[in-house]
């Protein structure tokens, strides 16, 4: 049975090993779109947008997927002492990486919006599955963790409904694999790690992963612009509201 690839919204699913591959891919994307509709930052009807527009002190109901993502995000925020923080959204809004001639925001605007950043401004109610902000102006953005969650849930769907298949799910830096690669004796899948600032498809390293494993890569080269000979990238430091200065151009986690 041959394989098929489908690309939607920068998400790629390649699958094979079963006759109804199109149904497999379509079903996996349905799982993704359901999650996306809830965690979208831009869809006014999403769970995230409803929370973002809610006033302080008023609990906002979370759907099961959004609750799980927020719960895990807060765990990571605490473990990293705030280096990862989903409340970075008010500062993110100041940074424009899409315009033809982007410029960094004024420092006074960053400072003004930093007062809304801090995961301690969130109260997650595990019993009622609600999220409450303690001050007005707090917003969350699940873009830093939602993609990986959606990728994992899509893989679980494939595993449950098409156990004899194989699949590669590439969701913009989040790569999960399932099953046995028919082109490899050991069944592994080879994933290339993009060379920072090089042409797309130029890899710094090739890594083999097996069924159920994943590799996630993020880097300063993915969304960035130069201004006055300085590189400004999209990975913001919640403590400063400016691009992080870790010294790394790319980090991958297996």
Residue ranges with predicted function:
Residues 3-254:
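Mature catalytic core of soluble alpha/beta enzymes
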